[in-house]
């Protein structure tokens, strides 16, 4: 069964995903660090899982929990690169699908931009 896992620390479309999946039978799991804790109540098909605030803790939990039938929503290219061959779909919150053909280019671009920022 398809399940949506959201990298919830910085995802601006959580509410939209929840609205779109209501009454579809698709379960949604939002994974967040404790520093992004929320008291917001969600419908029964939505669960929230909190992890420690450590670096990449949310990413590691998503990798651990995801299966071949899952859809993962993230804007983290590093996380996406770990999942493109593991899950059904990995996508950015803007709808861009990450795949084995485009992920290396995105990682290279991220690296080059970081190098430029270091140079000032």
Q: Which residues does each predicted region cover?
A:
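Nuclease catalytic cores that cleave nucleic-acid phosphodiester bonds
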Residues: 2-120
């Amino acid at each position: 069964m398809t399940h949506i896992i959201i990298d919830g620390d910085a995802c601006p479309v959580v509410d939209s995903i929840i609205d779109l999946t209501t009454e579809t039978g698709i379960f949604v799991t939002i994974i967040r660090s404790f520093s992004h804790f929320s008291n917001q109540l969600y419908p029964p098909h939505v669960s929230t899982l909190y992890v420690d605030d450590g670096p990449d803790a949310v990413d590691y939990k998503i990798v651990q929990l995801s299966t071949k039938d899952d859809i993962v929503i993230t804007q983290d290219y590093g996380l996406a690169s770990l999942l493109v061959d593991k899950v059904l779909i990995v996508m950015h919150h803007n709808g861009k699908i990450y795949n084995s053909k485009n992920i290396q280019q995105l990682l290279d671009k991220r690296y080059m931009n970081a190098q430029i920022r270091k140079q000032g």
